[in-house]
């Protein structure tokens, strides 16, 4: 996960991470605190205020969802190579890549060197974004030709990709998306008649369809 600093930030506590406007930071954990993310810059980790940064769009990032839910989501996408990246349930800051293999879903643990680089096999990457881009054109599997492919859009009608919250919603588990009445949510997927998947304020998760109204922007 990459983000760009909108403003400079000076750390005032030992666990905070200082950065300058324009810096690109790696987000390690955005699930545990509403206002602070854990991030890394030039090999140093610490907490940063989320309102000082802009998270780059990551439709493939699904947050801390379970392995089972990842499989359910990907098996509903009927194309080989459909994928998502999720945060480990047991080890915050660690990630897995889940990939549709056609008849099943395979999971790859993303490993990290001491220097902070990410890898699955031999190639090393500075960020998850670089890893994803590499495996779009290089097979992620060893015994089959499988390339990462973005989810095919399910929302075809103009203006139907956004919804406005009609009520407050508080997530009951890490896979869900909290929001306040009036918030605008980007709808990423409609895997279920009652639950949609969307993004708001840099977070991605599931929310009840009955709490929102599609809007034209």
Curated annotation (Swiss-Prot):
Presence of keyword Repeat: yes
The entry's keywords: Deafness, Disease variant, Membrane, Non-syndromic deafness, Repeat, SH2 domain, SH3 domain, Synapse
MF (Gene Ontology): epidermal growth factor receptor binding; phosphotyrosine residue binding
Domain annotation SH3: ranges: 1-58, 158-217
Protein biosynthesis as UniProt keyword: no
Pfam families per UniProt: SH2, SH3_1
Alphabetized InterPro entries for the sequence: GRAP_N_SH3, Grb2-like, SH2, SH2_dom_sf, SH3-like_dom_sf, SH3_domain
GO cellular component, one term: COP9 signalosome
CDD domains membership: SH2_Grb2_like, SH3_GRAP_C, SH3_GRAP_N
GO biological process terms, semicolon-separated: cell-cell signaling; Ras protein signal transduction; regulation of MAPK cascade; sensory perception of sound; signal transduction
Lipid bilayer topology: Peripheral membrane protein
Annotated compartments: Membrane; Synapse
SH2 domain ranges (all copies): 60-154
SUPFAM superfamilies the record matches: SH2 domain, SH3-domain
Function field: Couples signals from receptor and cytoplasmic tyrosine kinases to the Ras signaling pathway. Plays a role in the inner ear and in hearing.
PANTHER family listed in its UniProt record: PROTEIN ENHANCER OF SEVENLESS 2B (PTHR46037)
Disease the record associates with this protein: Deafness, autosomal recessive, 114: A form of non-syndromic deafness characterized by congenital profound sensorineural hearing loss. Sensorineural deafness results from damage to the neural receptors of the inner ear, the nerve pathways to the brain, or the area of the brain that receives sound information.
Family note: Belongs to the GRB2/sem-5/DRK family.
Subunit relationships: Associates through its SH2 domain with ligand-activated receptors for stem cell factor (KIT) and erythropoietin (EPOR). Also forms a stable complex with the Bcr-Abl oncoprotein. GRAP is associated with the Ras guanine nucleotide exchange factor SOS1, primarily through its N-terminal SH3 domain. Interacts with phosphorylated LAT upon TCR activation. Interacts with SHB.
Record protein name field: GRB2-related adapter protein
Naturally occurring in which organism (per UniProt): Homo sapiens
């Amino acid at each position: 996960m990459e983000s760009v600093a909108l403003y400079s930030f000076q750390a005032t506590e030992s666990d905070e991470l200082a950065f300058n406007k324009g810096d690109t930071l790696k987000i390690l954990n955005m699930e545990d605190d509403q206002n602070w993310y854990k991030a890394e810059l030039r090999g140093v980790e610490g907490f940063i205020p989320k309102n000082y940064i802009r998270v780059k769009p990551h439709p493939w990032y699904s947050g801390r969802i379970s392995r089972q839910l990842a499989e359910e989501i990907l098996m509903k996408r009927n194309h080989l190579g459909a994928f998502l990246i999720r945060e480990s349930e047991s080890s915050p800051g660690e990630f897995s890549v889940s990939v549709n293999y056609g008849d099943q879903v395979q999971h790859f643990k993303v490993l990290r060197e001491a220097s902070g680089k990410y890898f699955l096999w031999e190639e090393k990457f500075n960020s998850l974004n670089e890893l994803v881009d590499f495996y779009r054109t290089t097979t992620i599997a060893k015994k089959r030709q499988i390339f990462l492919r973005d989810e095919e859009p399910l929302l075809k009608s103009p203006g139907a990709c956004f919804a406005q919250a009609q009520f407050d919603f508080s997530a009951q588990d890490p896979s869900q998306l909290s929001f306040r009445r009036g918030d605008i949510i980007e709808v990423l997927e409609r895997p279920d008649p009652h639950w949609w998947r969307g993004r708001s304020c840099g977070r991605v998760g599931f929310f009840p369809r009955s709490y929102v109204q599609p809007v034209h922007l």
